[in-house]
């Protein structure tokens, strides 16, 4: 019976463990790099992220909308995303998977077994513009 050779995270000199949070951050940043991704997370996660950004000293969490399971040699990823209107969702998903797998495997040495995407919303042009031309309804 053959035994698997140790991966880059385990050697005769010791073992390296990588926290879920580290993989979560790598995944979040790699997903955001893909053209066609507007944001990560569902509605509630994005709302909390927007509130968090307004608090002095806080920063946007790169792990928002990202869930990972990390084992000794493998990782599985679940992502919730918002895509840009007009982009092919299938092409964006393919690019996200490719970028996430490349980033995680390249930076950690973990084998990514799956990258599951849930597209929760589509960002429409003009969604970010506040309509200040309309007068307030209540004075």
Regions flagged by a language model, labelled:
Residues 7-16:
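Short hinge/gating elements
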Residues 105-125:
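Intrinsically disordered, low-complexity glycine/proline-rich and charged
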Residues 1-8, 123-139:
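Short, charged, intrinsically disordered terminal tails
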Residues 44-80, 124:
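Short edge beta-strands and adjacent turn/loop segments
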Residues 31-40, 110:
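Short acidic amphipathic segments
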Residues 27, 89-108, 112:
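Short, non-transmembrane amphipathic alpha-helical segments
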Residues 72-94:
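A short interface-forming secondary-structure element
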Residues 17, 26-28, 67-69, 76-82, ...:
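Soluble periplasmic/extracytoplasmic beta-strand elements of cell-envelope proteins
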